[in-house]
Structures are given as structure tokens and as C-alpha cells.
Amino acid sequence: ACTTGAQNTIVGGFTGDAITTGDYNTAVGVHAVGSTTTADSNTGIGYNSLNSNTTGTNNTALGRNSLDASTTATEGTAVGMDALTANTTGEANTALGKSAMAANTTGSYNAAGGLNALQANTTAGDNTAFGVNAMLVNTTGHSNVAMGRSALDACTTGSGNVALGMDALGAHTTGADNVAVGKNALDANTTANNNVAIGTNSLGANTTATGNVAIGTNAMLTNTTGANDTAVGYLALDANTTGEDNTAVGKGALGANTTASGNTAVGKDSLVTNTTGANNVAVGWIALTTNSTGANNVGVGRSALASNSTGGDNTAVGYQALNANTTGASNTSVGYTSLTSNTTGTNNVALGHRALTAVTTSANNTGLGHDAGSIITTGANNLCLGNDSGLSGSPGGTLITDSNHIMVGDGSVTNAHIQVDWTVA
């Protein structure tokens, strides 16, 4: 019976009947705040709410059986039937919704809002779950944030995860330090760690792969076990399954890539049709856009190596450099439209504006300088050095289909100097 306690409000049978010196308590409902003796500033509204509390202070329980097992815990807030019903000594927990944090015993500093949110949590702390069934089966996983219906709802012991959106990280069980923002983001992830998925369905099929970053709707949508990939943009790397160490930035970049690894694509639709080609670099709009299995290519510039399919070991830098190349290999092209007509030619080197721009199927040509060898089509094994070399009016005349020539300079050259005598083999 109350002896010296002051400012208490008691309504209901067997309600607050153990209070002796406790002050500022409010108990409404049968057995509400029924065991409290000296504790202060508790509010229990509903049958059995805060029924077992003895000395815990500053608790608020609204709803039948809310916080009814709590004994000495403080700063708890439970709103809803069976909210925090098993809590004994867990501190500073907030549970809003029927059965929210219903199994929690000693876990502290958790916040749960929504039907069954954090329902199975027992001893874990520092979790935040808002949404129906958010973090539904979590037991000992700590420091997680889940917002959205069924977000992180399968997580049991995983820690340090952030899931924002319906079903975000929905299948996740024990993996740690993942971030999923968007509906179904990382939805199939189970035990993988250190992934970041931002956007609807991003990394949606990922199961055990780690170290991935996917930003954009459907980015890395079908990835399952491919690790250490980065995809930024709508549909970037969206078909990737097991390919690793890829970087895709831009809408559709590396969109068809499945198992290939070590590719870098920056720009809309760059490397968009690549499937198994590895170790390619594409920077620029539709750079290497039709590449499928070609490997070890570098395309930098709009439309660089845009038609390449299976050709490998090519380097193209500049607008439309090696633009028409399909299966040609081991070519180097630096400059505006240099080697732009090459399709199957190999081992060509073009450095300069429009250098070797007309070469199609020939091999082993070198053009260094503005328009160097720019009208050669099928001639092979030519060396053109200097502005307009190999064109009409240049020393030696025009090279188109001829092979095995060395052409130096244009028609304006008046002097040639060399330190030593020429030696004829």
C-alpha cells in the first residue's frame, strides 16, 4: 500500500497496489504497474502493463501485457498489445505496434515500430526497425537499421546492416555491414557482407557475394556470387551473375555482362553487350558498345571501338577511334577518327588526327601524324611519318593498296637531316 508516494494515479483492480514510496506513477487497468514499489515516473495503461516492474523508472507501457515482464529496466516505451512483453532488464527500448519486440529480454537501446517489428529480438541492442515484420526474426544481431515492410525480416544474427525499403535485405540472415536502399534491394542476400545497393531491385539476386556497390534501379539485378563489382546507373551490370572486379558507370554500362571480370565501363551503353570479355576499359558514350567476348581492349572516347565484338588487345583513344573494328586485334589508335574504318586488320598503329583512317583489313601499318597514311585501305606493312605522309603530293606519292613502303613527310618538306649514313640491308 502507498505510504509516502506522491502524485500517483491509480485506476483499476489490483492496480499499483504495491507502490510504497514511488512517485508520479500512472496505472490504468487490472494489474497495471502491479509490482512497483519505490519506482518513479512510470505509466502503465492496459491489462498487465508494467505488471512486474519493481524499481524501474521512466517507463511507458500502453496496451495489454506491454512491458509486463520488466522488473528493473528504465526508459522503456511500449505501445501495443504484447509490445516488449518479455523485456526484463533491457534499457531504453522503444516498441510501437502489436508484438513489437515481444521476445526482447535484456537487449537495450532498440527502437521498433510496426506489427511484429523486432519480434524475436532477445539480447541484441542498438537496432532500429520500423515497418510491419521489419527485422522479424532477429535474435542477437545488433546495430542494424531496417525501415519498410519485411525489411531485414529474415536476419537473425547479422549486424551493422542498413535496409530501407520494402523487402530490402529481405532474405538476409547472418551477413554484416550491408546497405540496401530501395524496394527489393539486396532482397536475396543471405550471408554476404559489405555490399551497398541503392535503387529498386539493385543487387536483388545477390546471395553470398561481397564487396559490391550498385546504385540505380536494377543495377546488378541478377548478380549472385560475383564480388567486388561497382555499378552506377540504371541497368548497369544488370545481367552480371558471377563476374568480379567490374566497374560500370552509366545507364546500361556493362548491361549484358554475365561472368566476365576486370572490366571498366564509364558512359551510357559502354560495353553494353559484353558477356564474357574480360579486362576491357571503355570510357565514353557507346565505347566498346558491341563487344561480346573481346578481351584486353581499351576504348576511350565517344564511339571508340564501338563495333568491336571479339577483337582483343586493342587500344583506341579519341572520337570514333577504331570505331568499325569487329575482330581486328592488337591495334593501337590515338586521335580523332584514327583507324576508324578498320574491321579485321591487326597490328596497326595510328597516332594523330585521321591517321590510317581508311584502313579496313590490312595489317602492320604505322601512321604517325595528322592524316598520316589516311587513304591506305588494304595496303600492309607501311610506315607513314609526318603530316599528310602517304597522300598525293607527298614524297613517294599516294599509298592506297600498296604495301611495304616507308613514307616520310608531305610535299612541303625541303630538307632532310640525319647524323649518320644509311645502311642498306
Residue locations for each model-derived region?
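Glycine- and small/polar-enriched repetitive beta-structure motifs of secreted/surface proteins
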Residues: 1-425
